[in-house]
């Protein structure tokens, strides 16, 4: 029998915290200014109208309004927030 415990149990037992990335608000939903729309690594989705890009590539709304996901060229996506008053007037 081994008189030492071995290295298996002492080297295990760690796990990193989850990052909670992804789309937080979907198209057609209403948001208030400062609401986080997408958490991402790099610009998977680009900032459109009334949307800013945070230091960690988080996209957030600058105005109150309705979220819309759109194409940006052939292979890119962008998210925009259009003010609710303008959205109701066009509907």
UniProtKB/Swiss-Prot annotation:
Family matches, as InterPro entries: Ribosomal_bL27
Protein name (Swiss-Prot/TrEMBL): Large ribosomal subunit protein bL27
Region annotation (Disordered) ranges: 1-22
Source domain of life: Bacteria
Compositional bias ranges of the Polar residues kind: 7-19
Gene: rpmA
Gene Ontology terms: cellular component: cytosolic large ribosomal subunit
Keyword field: Ribonucleoprotein, Ribosomal protein
Family statement: Belongs to the bacterial ribosomal protein bL27 family.
